[in-house]
Amino acid sequence: MEAPEYLDLDEIDFSDDISYSVTSLKTIPELCRRCDTQNEDRSVSSSSWNCGISTLITNTQKPTGIADVYSKFRPVKRVSPLKHQPETLENNESDDQKNQKVVEYQKGGESDLGPQPQELGPGDGVGGPPGKSSEPSTSLGELEHYDLDMDEILDVPYIKSSQQLASFTKVTSEKRILGLCTTINGLSGKACSTGSSESSSSNMAPFCVLSPVKSPHLRKASAVIHDQHKLSTEETEISPPLVKCGSAYEPENQSKDFLNKTFSDPHGRKVEKTTPDCQLRAFHLQSSAAESKPEEQVSGLNRTSSQGPEERSEYLKKVKSILNIVKEGQISLLPHLAADNLDKIHDENGNNLLHIAASQGHAECLQHLTSLMGEDCLNERNTEKLTPAGLAIKNGQLECVRWMVSETEAIAELSCSKDFPSLIHYAGCYGQEKILLWLLQFMQEQGISLDEVDQDGNSAVHVASQHGYLGCIQTLVEYGANVTMQNHAGEKPSQSAERQGHTLCSRYLVVVETCMSLASQVVKLTKQLKEQTVERVTLQNQLQQFLEAQKSEGKSLPSSPSSPSSPASRKSQWKSPDADDDSVAKSKPGVQEGIQVLGSLSASSRARPKAKDEDSDKILRQLLGKEISENVCTQEKLSLEFQDAQASSRNSKKIPLEKRELKLARLRQLMQRSLSESDTDSNNSEDPKTTPVRKADRPRPQPIVESVESMDSAESLHLMIKKHTLASGGRRFPFSIKASKSLDGHSPSPTSESSEPDLESQYPGSGSIPPNQPSGDPQQPSPDSTAAQKVATSPKSALKSPSSKRRTSQNLKLRVTFEEPVVQMEQPSLELNGEKDKDKGRTLQRTSTSNESGDQLKRPFGAFRSIMETLSGNQNNNNNYQAANQLKTSTLPLTSLGRKTDAKGNPASSASKGKNKAA
């Protein structure tokens, strides 16, 4: 049949059947070996043809029940194109047998061919015209409504597995057909006995090895052999299929699949006999399929008894071919495989077909197989206890993992089960970073925990650290995995890595643990700071009420603008002996302001700097008095009153003020402690960033003194800061004064520099009482110095912090702009300081101690910012001084407070500028 595979029925000369069959016989054995799919038509030995063909022809009974059963699986028919059968179940069933018979007939060339084609004709259409038997008409009719499926024509080679199954079911129908054809076969015809069938099967066996498709027939043949008489014809019929099938072993496998179908065989006796045989073979095949090799079993001696091992070998061959197809990912071949047993096929490692497809990365093949086999197979584990998803992770097949996790039930494996770890455990175990990254992203989207532990209490970080995969550890840490968890052995991941000798991983994990603990501490400190801020706010509210009460008293007593604590205050002239109380009270707000600034800075540095800055600005405005933004003049007046009157009222209010100041000092210490800690944590780096936001709050240019002091030495500033924080409000000021004196050197007053601009501003503003001015000046410088000291902490720590570079880059413009003028400004300021200090140094000292406290506390608010900016930006103290000076003058108009204060404070700032330039 090899040559005429695609012949038209008309072209076949049935009178020439003998020669035709001879040619096909010559080629068939080779073909069978080459192509299992074509074995049906070609794989029949000439000797077997005589018996088998006659028996087949004799057994031309039309199947009815089995045909129906078989119709469910309409495999691509194993018949040569000539035999294209209609899709009738009978036809389909008979097609395989008929095809086989046709081949046999043609090969036999004897009268068998003639009759058999008739049988085949109905089913296959190949034998239709030659049909000598009574069924030729049927064959013709079937040919007429026969529809050529491209699958049948083109996929014939691959039909073998499905066709085998089909042929198996067809075998029963074929048996019926054989009954019809018994008279037809002239050679063995009705006489064909089990012996003939056996001989045919044995003859066919050598070729059968290669054709699993025929195994169903073989199995049926063996069953038929049991029906030796009438069934003997069927047996022979079946035996030809055996011959063609060439897989005595496979029949067993298929018999397993088709046992039920054979049972449904209309011929009860046939079914009975077939069933025991098939069952025996099927079970035997399952148990011993691996035991027997088809070649050995194929020997002509093999008969029905030997068909079991033969079928097994055939089954093994089929399984092997399926495994190879899946390994290669040839999806086009899959449809031609028998689909019933796919889920039972495993390789030597316990891998099912899904394991194999996933491990090889054949995503399309995996999807197709999953649809055929069902998603339950995705839960099977191989000898390594890996599911297909786990095996895909082991082999780094990201696409397969992606599809299984996102599209199938394998998503359940993202969580640890009672007995098995999760997929990220496998990814960490096998070092698959890319897959781990995708899994973590997916788990984050799905809200699945990354810290689930396996039965040993190991998290994914533990597993990755035990196997030394640093990249996986880093990926897990980036996605927030917990590195401090302990497994059942009480080990952290870092300890596990150390125990396994992965020092690099353990070091990395130790660093991460340290950072985590620091971060937790920072969080705690932030909470504390927030609480303290709340306390401060309440204190500020109380102070505000107190100040408002003092307001009326303060306004009643006018005085020369002695205290230039704020630029506007220079113009305002209010002096009252009672104002001392106010000034003292005001000093507390100043301290609180400073504290609040620090607190807000540290807090904002940890969280959202900008948002917190705005909030802190609002709080500060409230603390300073809601009037700061609205009524700057009033506040300036108040500050003047407080400063001037501070000394007189100090004694009366000493006790409550001291208490408050102690409280404030304590708060301040806490704040500075937290600030220093945050600085070390590189949190302070954001302080400068936050300060620019506060420019609006910095209404007064006080930094002259601060800058001078900072110029002289940062160390002295540090000492002063420490003293400042440690000392209560009253003591603080004298320290700062001393420091400023020593630093200035020119004048006894700490505010030598600031005094000059202050005097100027006062003169243009009100031109009254110069002595008061100097006294005010020291007050202003002292606050400046305190603010500078406070600020100094942040810049110093900033130098150490990694973010200091960022700060410097941000403030670079300031540094560049003011670098040169710094020297000039320093000189003039020093000179001015010298002159003014000489004149009014004593008074300044005396009042500065009292007023200083008020001013310092008040000053730090504005000075703090400018100094923060300048210090953080320019790490040279010299630059800091001038940058602060100019910054204040330049920025004042821009700030919300500055606009109002500028009107009053402008003369001072302009005067200071002019003097600096002149010098």
From Swiss-Prot:
It is found in: Cytoplasm. PROSITE patterns: ANK_REP_REGION, ANK_REPEAT. It holds the Pfam family Ank_2. Keywords: ANK repeat, Coiled coil, Cytoplasm, Neurodegeneration, Parkinson disease, Parkinsonism, Repeat, Ubl conjugation. SUPFAM superfamilies: Ankyrin repeat (SSF48403). Residues 686-700, 833-842 have a biased composition (Basic and acidic residues). ANK repeats lie at residues 349-380, 384-413, 419-448, 456-485, 603-632, 699-729. One of its GO terms (cellular component) is presynaptic membrane. Residues 515-552 form a coiled coil. Residues 80-99, 108-140, 287-313, 549-615, 666-713, 728-919 are annotated as: Disordered. Gene3D superfamilies: 6.10.250.750, Ankyrin repeat-containing domain. GO terms for biological process: cell death; dopamine metabolic process; regulation of inclusion body assembly; regulation of neurotransmitter secretion. Residues 299-308, 844-854 have a biased composition (Polar residues). GO terms for molecular function: identical protein binding; ubiquitin protein ligase binding. Residues 555-571, 667-685, 774-785, 874-886 have a biased composition (Low complexity). Detected in brain (at protein level). Widely expressed, with highest levels in brain, heart and placenta. Homodimer. Heterodimer of isoform 1 and isoform 2. Interacts with SIAH1, SIAH2, SNCA, RNF19A and PRKN. Isoform 2 has a strong tendency to form aggregates and can sequester isoform 1. It is linked to Parkinson disease: A complex neurodegenerative disorder characterized by bradykinesia, resting tremor, muscular rigidity and postural instability. Additional features are characteristic postural abnormalities, dysautonomia, dystonic cramps, and dementia. The pathology of Parkinson disease involves the loss of dopaminergic neurons in the substantia nigra and the presence of Lewy bodies (intraneuronal accumulations of aggregated proteins), in surviving neurons in various areas of the brain. Constructs encoding portions of SNCA and SNCAIP co-transfected in mammalian cells promote cytosolic inclusions resembling the Lewy bodies of Parkinson disease. Coexpression of SNCA, SNCAIP, and PRKN result in the formation of Lewy body-like. ubiquitin-positive cytosolic inclusions. SNCAIP isoform 2 is particularly aggregation-prone. Familial mutations in PRKN disrupt the ubiquitination of SNCAIP and the formation of the ubiquitin-positive inclusions. Isoform 2 inhibits the ubiquitin ligase activity of SIAH1 and inhibits proteasomal degradation of target proteins. Isoform 2 inhibits autoubiquitination and proteasomal degradation of SIAH1, and thereby increases cellular levels of SIAH. Isoform 2 modulates SNCA monoubiquitination by SIAH1. This is Synphilin-1. The gene is SNCAIP.
